Amino acid sequence: MGRKWANIKEKKASKDKTNSRIYAKFGIEIYVAAKSGDPDPHSNQKLRFVIERAKTYNVPKHIIDRAIEKAKGTGDETYSELRYEGFGPNGSMIIVDALTNNVNRTASDVRAAYSKNGGNMGVSGSVAYMFDNTAIFGVEGKDADELLELLMEADIDVRDILDEDGQAIIYAEPEDFHKVQEGLKAAGIEEFTVAEIEMIPQNDIQLSGEDLEKFERLIDALEDLEDVQKVYHNVELED
C-alpha cells in the first residue's frame, strides 16, 4: 500500500509545478459539477467533492468561486466525462480520465499521445479490471491507530489505515468518501493532504532504462493534454 501512496504523492508533486494548468483543470471540473445540479456545495455532493480535492492542490478560493459563478449563468457549454484505457512499455497499464467539450478532439489527442510515445490504446475494460476504485485521505498530526479508533467509534468502516511519510493514509470504499470525510470533520479534522477517489493498481510493476524513459514521456504527454483530468497507472515510481 505504501508504494501506491508514493505514486499518488509523486503525481501531486509533479502537478504542483504547473499550478496554472492545475487551476484551469479544476476550474472546468468545478464548473461541470456546479452545472450538473445546485451550485451550492452544501446540497451538491459532487461539487463538494471536487472542491475538497481542489483544496488539497491549493487551488485559490477566487478560482473556485469564479467557476461556480460561471455555472450560475445562462451558458450551455456541455462537457462529457470520458475514460480511455491503454498500455505503455513492457506491461504497463494506463487509465486516462478526461472532461471535454469536444469528444473527437480529445480522442484524437489521447490516441496521438499513446502512439507517439510507445503506447497503445485499448478497448473499454481492457485495463480497468486490474485497478480498484478507492477513496483516499491523508491526515497529518494523527497516527493510524488514533484514526482507526476514531472511525470505529463513529461506526465507519474503511479498507486500511497506514502510517506513511509522517501522516496517516486512509483507504476506503469510494461510495463511503463523504461518510469518512464527515466522520473525520466531526472529530475536528478539517485539513487533508489528499482527499481523492483514485484508481489504485492491484499490482505494481517496475520499469528501468529505456522502458522507464518511454513510460515517463507517455505519462507526461497524456497529463499535458488540456482535456485530461487524471492519469492512473501501475508503474512503481521512485520518490
Swiss-Prot record:
Keywords: Cytoplasm, DNA-binding, Transcription, Transcription regulation. InterPro entries: Integrase-like_N, TACO1_YebC-like_2nd/3rd_dom, TACO1_YebC_N, Transcrip_reg_TACO1-like, Transcrip_reg_TACO1-like_dom3, Transcrip_reg_TACO1_YeeN, YebC-like. It holds the Pfam family Transcrip_reg. It is found in: Cytoplasm. Gene3D superfamilies: 1.10.10.200, 3.30.70.980. GO terms for cellular component: cytosol. The keyword Acetylation does not apply. NCBIfam families: PRK00110.1, PRK12378.1, YebC/PmpR family DNA-binding transcriptional regulator. Belongs to the TACO1 family. YeeN subfamily. This is Probable transcriptional regulatory protein lmo0369. It comes from Listeria monocytogenes serovar 1/2a (strain ATCC BAA-679 / EGD-e).
